[in-house]
Amino acid sequence: LSSRPPGAASGYLVVGEGGVVREAGEAEVSAGTTVEVRDLFFNTPARGKFLKSPATEQGAILRVVTQLTLAHADVHVRLTANGRLVLNAPPARTPRERLGALYGFGLAAKLLEVSGESGGVRLLGVVAPPSVSRTHRDDIHLIVNGRTVRDTLLTQALIEAYRPLLPRDQFPLAVLVL
């Protein structure tokens, strides 16, 4: 883990191996924060046996990083795997901008902005028109107080709102921030 605030002369570096901190202190590092993970289960091979294929595990990591990226649109997020850039999302001012970096700006241009306030709760976000649907619920993103959440009740409410507009096996794409 390395981190340096913009404009600072130096940053901080922490290197851990096998649950032990090998190095920690001030260091010359790039601006921003970098988390690098290598050989995660080198000293616990039994854990490695439960891993799926590398592609499946990388997909799971990408889903988690995508959720974090949506929840923190003001942060530049870059994900590399095996030396290849998998995700690059510069800071964004709106959920639409962030989704553009993640899913493509052509899709982001089709999204509909939503907002509302009731009882002290404010909602804003973007939803896809019925012509842009998915065969899974993975692209329904709910962010509450800066954290991504999986909430069956909120997800089901969104799906029910779309029910008259989508076939039974199709789901909306949405980012809703509460």
Model segments located where?
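N-terminal phosphate-binding caps/lids of nucleotide- and nucleic-acid-binding domains
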Residues: 1-178
